[in-house]
């Protein structure tokens, strides 16, 4: 996606025309009104044990057949959540790692790193070590299904991997970082683009204009020129996945703030990381969770080893917080939150 990412930034720029820490003894929230606030749990420790601890702090048991949705990472991307980090949590819930194929290719010479069909995706999954620890399921390997969407201003349904029907509960285990198109990637991105099949990704990225993936046409202004439409489509699709699992056994959300490049794990050769690792946050509200992470980045100070400037610039350039704002507007969650430290 190296060449594609550079092209997309040009297209979307046209279309879109400290380490300060939360005080663990006080509430850190977007609004002083204590009503209708979500709890966001925080640990500054990033470790296998910390992931289990923050899962338990939520007080929601993962029941039945548990899907753990991650990004397996493009082949040469070094920043994805490593299996060694997440293994204790996945084993704790007897979970299956779930993913879907992508909707883009990489530049010449990087074809081995692609994940746009199951054959090459499985090679990357094995190379990144996931099959050494867990059962893994590419949910759109064989089929896809449509699930209902509440907010239909852009997309009329969400096209997701067909194997989603095999699971009762989802843990959205998200790597928080930048994203070339969304500005940032967190819970809302992993729920929407992450759970969508290749065709579903095209449908969301094009704001409902393309239902059958055509990579030669998708990444052109005709299909991805509506930046806010794309962000609103992501929010709608995230709500669809959340509603799907809430009608089953449930869903929870965990954001890991480490290796925070301005580029997503879908970028084969991401920009260097300029931010220090921060911690792990978790919530039963994906909107509050992403808002808390963005606020943490906003509150970072520039030091010799920590510089949020590029990530904040990318979020602003791509209008990234609009996804959070729209998700709140359509009733997916609230941007008001209270930080609860578990350290």
Where are the predicted features?
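C-terminal motif of bacterial Sec signal peptides marking the signal peptidase cleavage site
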Residues: 13-16
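Bacterial lipoprotein signal-peptidase II cleavage site
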Residues: 18-25
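Extended, low-polarity segments enriched in aliphatic/aromatic residues
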Residues: 35-87, 92-343
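Sec-dependent signal peptide recognition
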Residues: 2-7
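Acidic/polar, low-complexity intrinsically disordered N-terminal segments immediately downstream
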Residues: 25-34
């Amino acid at each position: 996606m190296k060449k594609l990412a550079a092209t997309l930034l040009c297209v979307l720029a046209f279309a879109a025309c400290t380490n300060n820490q939360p005080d663990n003894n006080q509430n850190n929230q977007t609004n002083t009104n204590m009503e209708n606030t979500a709890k966001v749990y925080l640990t500054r420790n990033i470790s296998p044990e910390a992931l289990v601890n923050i899962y338990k702090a939520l007080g929601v048991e993962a029941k039945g057949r548990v899907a753990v949705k991650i990004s397996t990472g493009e082949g040469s991307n070094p920043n994805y959540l490593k299996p060694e980090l997440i293994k204790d949590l996945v084993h704790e819930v007897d979970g299956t790692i779930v993913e879907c194929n992508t909707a883009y290719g990489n530049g010449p010479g990087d074809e081995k790193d692609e994940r746009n069909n199951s054959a090459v995706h499985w090679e990357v999954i094995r190379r990144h070590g996931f099959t050494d620890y867990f059962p893994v399921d590419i949910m759109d390997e064989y089929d896809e299904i449509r699930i209902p969407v509440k907010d239909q201003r852009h997309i009329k349904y969400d096209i997701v991997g067909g194997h989603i029907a095999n699971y009762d509960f989802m843990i959205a285990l998200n790597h928080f970082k930048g994203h070339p198109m969304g500005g940032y990637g967190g819970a809302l991105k992993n729920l929407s683009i992450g759970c969508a099949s290749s065709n579903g990704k095209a449908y969301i990225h094009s704001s409902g204009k393309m239902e059958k993936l055509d990579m030669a046409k998708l990444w052109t202004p005709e299909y991805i020129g509506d930046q806010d439409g794309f962000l609103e489509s992501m929010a709608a699709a995230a709500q669809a996945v959340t509603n799907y699992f809430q009608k089953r056994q449930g869903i929870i959300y965990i954001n890991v703030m480490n290796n925070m490049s301005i580029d997503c794990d879908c970028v084969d050769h991401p920009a260097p990381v300029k931010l220090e690792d921060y911690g792990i946050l978790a919530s039963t509200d994906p909107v509050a969770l992403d808002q808390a992470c963005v606020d943490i980045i906003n509150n970072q100070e520039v030091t010799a080893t920590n510089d949020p400037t590029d990530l904040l610039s990318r979020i602003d350039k791509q209008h990234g917080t609009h996804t959070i704002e729209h998700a709140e507007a359509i009733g997916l969650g609230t941007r008001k939150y209270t930080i609860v430290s578990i350290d």
